[in-house]
Each structure stands twice: as C-alpha cells, then as structure tokens.
C-alpha cells in the first residue's frame, strides 16, 4: 500500500491508533461473528446432533481451510478493487454464514442436512474472514503508511482476539436464551451493521510498484510462516477443544477459559507495545514460544479447573506477540510494494495450521483422549523455539 504524506508520518500515538482502529474495527466485527459460536458449535455438533469429536473439530476447521484457500484471492482483489470493497465483501460473507446457521437451526430435525448447512456456513465464513481480515490490514496500512505496518498488525490482532474474548461467553448466553437461531440472528445483525458503517468510508490508493510473483514472495517468507504455523497450533487446540476438555473432566466454565486466553492475548499486546522494535522480532518470538509451551503443558497436566484457566492464560499471553514478532521480520524480506502480498502469504500458514489442527486433533482424541493434544501441541511449540533460534543465527550470518 502507498505511504501517506510526510505529515501523516508524524501523527501522535493516540491519533495514529485511532486512525488504525477506525479501519480494523471491521475485522473486529468479522471475528465477533467467529467468536459467538466458538464455544457453542463443538458441543452442539457433538452432543445435540450426536456426531463424533472428529466432526465437531471438522465443522470448526472448515472455516480455516476456506480462509487458507481464499487468502491469496483476497490479496489479489484488494489490489484490483481496493481494500474497502474487499472488507465489505468479507462482511457479506459473514452475513451469509449467519443465514446458513439459521437454516441449520430450522433443519435440526434432519441432522445430516443441518450438519451440511453448518459446514456450508463455516466455508463461507472462512472466505468472509480472509477478505475482511486481509482487507482491513491493507486498509489500515493504506491509512497510516507502511512504516506503521507492525502497529497495524498488532491492533488488528487485538481486535481479533478482543472480539473472541467478548464473543465466546456472549455466544453461550445468547445460545442459552434462544438457541442456535438467536445466535444466527445476532451474527446477521453484526454483519449488516458493519457493512453499513464501512460503505461510506473513503477508499485508499494501492501501491503502483511492480509486485513480485507469488512464488517469489513465498520463497522469502515460508520459513517464518512455518514458525507461525507451529505456534498457531496452541491457539487451535484451545479454541476448538477446550470445551470438550472441560466436558471430559466434568467441569463447567470452558467459555471463561477462552475469555482468559483472549484477555491475556490483548493484555500482552497492550502492555508490551514496543517490545518487537526494542528487542527484535525473533528474540520476542523465542520468549513467546516458551510461555505458550508452558501454558499448553499446564493444561495437559491439569487436575483442577483453575490450572486449566492458568494454562489458557499463559497460552494466550505467549501466542499474543508471535504473529507480529515473526510477521515484521517476514515482511521486511520483500520490497515495500509487496508487503501486502507478503503479509497475506505469511498469514496463510496460520490458516493451514488451524485447518489441520481440528480434524487431526479430533482423530487423536478419539484414540488417546482430549488431554494428549495439549502435550503434543506444547512439544510442537518447543520445535518452533528451535526454528526461531536457527533463523536468528542465519540472519546474523547474512549480515
């Protein structure tokens, strides 16, 4: 995206943040529609509809696969149409998802049809999320300039998990009051409101530099994307299976654990806004991976609900800065006119990890129980620590 005039580069921190928030709030709306059913759908598919943990995980993960496949198209259409139109298209996708949920509620007497409608809704939601999320990031960079891309990434993430922190418990309350149908109505209302707010906003100009082909961008960022993918598994198992973990233990309060994860995520970004600039992305990522792994191991071995909550808190705090810390390094590997493409390519690794986590973890649960997925996820994050060390040493060697 093109930089704004020099005067904009001197924006005060508050004004800069407000300008970013005025755009990434649309990603907040998109993720609110994701967070609302997050603590409801796994149990609904498993307990109400009677399907296995594999299908419960697959319903959630279909969204991530859809996001993965549509992310490159979101970046391409952002270049063709501008990020604003891509954001509006993404919000239209979340609206359609809400309608699919409503139809699934009406079809509850036919479980297979209801399941297919839920799956269709999750697929459309994935497209909507990739368009809204990618478009909001590029829109934010266009508003404040590419010099502030790290800040845009951080605020976009705060909106993402802030929406989930609000959405998970709110979705449980809505579901308890009116079932899946009322939850679907809430999703439709949020999506429509966000679309109406986005439409009057001005467009931003796209960069006129010659973009690198996708293969070239991928070649420069894939190593950092792999680290992101391994770190994202911890988020995936918390978000998708913490409800089933609580049920297996006979505990209540899974939605609160999700909220703690999201609160820790947002709080860490607010408490350490300059950590990446001060210490460097890979050094920050190392510390984050260590904290995330500790949280996952704690959940695995928890014998009391409060230990799971502490583990979720640590996992959220650790995962918080993983995306921007590694992302800033990844984006710096390409010319400025290709930063949007690099960011989208980098993000697809998280989409892939989250898409694989649901069904694979569901299969593992079917054979070995729920707790073991947190042990394996913690071990994978430890591998990411080794990878970050290696990339850091390679970067020093290149200098």
What are these regions (language model features)?
Residues 18-60, 64, 236-245, 249:
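Helix-loop boundary and gating motifs at the non-cytosolic
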Residues 28, 113-131, 308-321:
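Hydrophobic core of transmembrane alpha-helices in multi-pass small-molecule transporters
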Residues 64-72, 164-165, 265-270, 354-355:
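Residue-level signature of mid-helix packing/kink "hotspots" within the transmembrane helices
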Residues 69-107:
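Conserved MFS/SLC helix-loop-helix module at the cytosolic interface between two early adjacent transmembrane helices
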Residues 70-82, 175, 268-281, 365-366:
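Helix-to-loop junctions at the C-terminal end of transmembrane segments
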Residues 92-111, 291-303:
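C-terminal ends and interior cores of transmembrane alpha-helices
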Residues 121-159:
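Cytoplasmic helix-loop-helix junction between adjacent transmembrane helices
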Residues 188-206, 387-392:
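C-terminal membrane-cytosol helix-exit motif in multi-pass small-molecule transporters
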